[in-house]
């Protein structure tokens, strides 16, 4: 077994410095050395990681795979999905405890709604993959998730715990359509002997997304003990997540539109 120790160390150091930089930013000015210093280290080490991975015979993942648009867009989408899903577990406890004065077990029930929605629809999506393309299912899932988080962001000031639960459930339903089709799309872009490695990479990217969005969320809601500031920070965090979901949606939308255009052009002939 060949372990890419140098690649792992460079990746760990780069992500670690990025997270430290984002976390420090929530406490200090951008001009503080702990913010820009760690960010510069992140850029250098991540650049070295890319150079090393392209050079070594046993990389963590073959970076040439990212030349395939289907693969790279699906990997970016799982990064965003991992991060935005983490918001559903981070923000509600702050809001529900500070604003609505809910107890821990009640907050726990609200947080369960998103995973519940994912479980309810993931099995259905798994069966639909055989008759509907992965891109369509991912698009449906992303649109549903964008709708849920946009409503959470725009209506955060007037939402009650039940409405928050329903919107998180809606997000989970979208996630249930997205996740199985995303896994299938990623696996479909590589050969069978690469699927184990790519599956591990998908999970790694998802976890990096969780860590990244957790650090970013702290920028929005840190030092927000005041109710109005907490609601404002939470609203911005939901909308930021919704915007990144929209960015993840764009490549799939373009591909669907191109496919529809060529179909219509072919039919007209």
Residue locations for each model-derived region?
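12-transmembrane solute porter fold
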Residues: 8, 33-41, 58-262
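Short, positively charged
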Residues: 4
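Juxtamembrane helix-loop boundary signature in multi-pass membrane transporters
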Residues: 1, 22-23, 126, 155
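Structural signal for alpha-helical transmembrane segments and their membrane-water exit/capping regions
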Residues: 24, 45-57, 220-226
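Short acidic/polar alpha-helix capping motifs at helix-coil junctions
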Residues: 1, 27-29, 57-60
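Short, highly charged, low-complexity non-transmembrane loops/tails of multi-pass membrane proteins
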Residues: 265-269
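Alpha-helical transmembrane segments
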Residues: 16-19, 47, 90, 247
